[in-house]
Amino acid sequence: FEAALEHGSPRIELDVQMTADGVAVVTHDTSLRRCTGCSANIYDLPYAQVQQLDAGRWFHRQFTGSYIPTLEEVLALCKGKAELNIEIKPSTFTPTLEAETVRLIHAYNYGSDCVVTSQSYETLCKVKELDPDITTGYILALGVGTYYDLPAADFFSVESTFITAGMVQQIHLRGKTISAWTINRQQDAEKLLQLGVDDLITDKPEIIAPLLARDKALDNRLLWLRDQIQELFAAPDAEEAM
């Protein structure tokens, strides 16, 4: 997270799970084996024990000694510096994860600077019950089924290979937006932006961010042009009324 902030990333995606003693932590894997060598799952251990595990050396020796941070630590670090995409990864072993995540979002006044996403629609429903104003996104690995009208999903985050122009159109018709993941090549980003995708999730912000900025700048110019045309055609009507 410190590296992402140093590179000026305006938005950061993270995954949230929970330890045995109810601490919300930021980690992708439920199993601790890949990142730490520990055979336990994250929900099996109290945070004091999880914090002692080296979660950085597997990636690169320069990160030796890095530990799995709490969600609270990440919120404190990123507050005022970056928006967050908080993916909740629920488990039958962690029934209070949604409530704890929302509590921390409120504690750090992060509601307007984050979105909460999940592959579990039930999780999104719980979040909306706790705070209807939090923006929620439904993560879909397959772009099939009738999901466009799900009330607890403000937007959809879809695996990029399943996105079609028709899907984008249906989502936009309902006043919702669509994000694509995970886009690391310029040509893939260009194709998705042409389809009308609203946002891209990437591991390569230095490649993708300029394309998104350019696309949004074009949208702003088109909106300005639309307003100018509307004013032009409205002017004669106003004169006739006089």
Model-derived features: positions:
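Phosphate-group recognition and catalysis centered on beta-loop-alpha active-site segments
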Residues: 1-242
